A protein has these predicted regions:
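Structured loop/turn residues at beta-strand edges in well-structured enzyme cores
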Residues: 61, 111, 146
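P-loop NTPase motor core
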Residues: 70-143
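Generic detector of well-ordered alpha-helical segments enriched in charged/polar residues
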Residues: 52-55, 72-75, 93, 97-100, ...
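Conserved P-loop
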Residues: 1-61, 65-67, 72-73
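Phosphate-binding/switch region of NTP-binding enzymes
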Residues: 115-120, 125-185
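P-loop/Walker A phosphate-binding loop and immediately adjacent motor/lid segment at beta-alpha junctions
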Residues: 40-46, 54, 160-203
Length: 203
């Protein structure tokens, strides 16, 4: 089964730059905003405009690592791109259901792919880590982080860009003994290898 992994954090904390050591042959980079990569790379970004586009990309993806960047803006596009004639509750409800379809498509894949969903925080002042989704429909009906046991936080610690990786009650979580330290450098190649080795029973 494919794995769903969230990497959440404030803008500019090193989520996208964590791809810097990956090659285009091993990663599919799906961007919601269309922003160019913040480093020199041969990785070819694939821009999507809707949750339906993401769903199709997930189903069609073959590469072992798939990154969906700025996931939270899928909700922004769904809500602010809707017609003013649409019932607002229906708009939020549809966004919630469409996002669930993406999660379902990932978890239903009979592959060893790792899907990383990068996103901003719901509330930067909150002590609980959560994906920004707009409105309450998604969080009430389909708590995104509940579908996985791997949620990382991107942050800057002592001028170093890192991922917070060990379960600590804040919403950050990972399986027992997957990581030896509270934080790791924001290098997705290293992190991905660590996850794969863990599930293969290697150290």
């Amino acid at each position: 089964m494919a794995r769903l992994i969230f990497v959440l954090g404030n803008p500019g904390t090193g989520k996208t730059t964590s791809l810097r050591n990956l090659k285009k042959e091993e990663v599919a980079y799906i961007t919601v905003t269309g922003k160019e990569l913040p480093f020199r790379s041969t990785i070819n970004p694939v821009q999507v405009k809707s949750m339906d586009d993401v769903h199709k990309a997930v189903v069609a993806s073959k590469k072992s690592i798939v990154v969906i960047d700025d996931t939270n803006y899928l909700f922004t596009k769904a809500v602010f791109g809707a017609s003013e004639k649409d019932d607002k509750w229906d708009v939020y409800d549809k966004a919630s259901k469409d996002f669930y379809k993406i999660v379902e498509a990932i978890l239903n894949k009979d592959t060893q792919q790792n899907f990383y969903l990068f996103g901003h925080l719901e509330d930067v002042e909150s002590k609980t880590l959560a994906l920004k989704t707009l409105g309450q429909a998604t969080r009430r009906n389909n708590n995104p982080e509940g579908w996985t046991n791997i949620v990382f936080e991107s942050l800057v610690d002592m001028d170093e860009f890192v991922f917070k990786v060990k379960t600590d009650g804040s919403g950050v979580k990972s399986p027992m003994e997957m990581f030896d330290t509270e934080t790791v450098p924001n290098d997705l190649r290293v992190v991905n290898d660590k996850i794969n080795k863990y599930y293969k029973g290697d150290k």
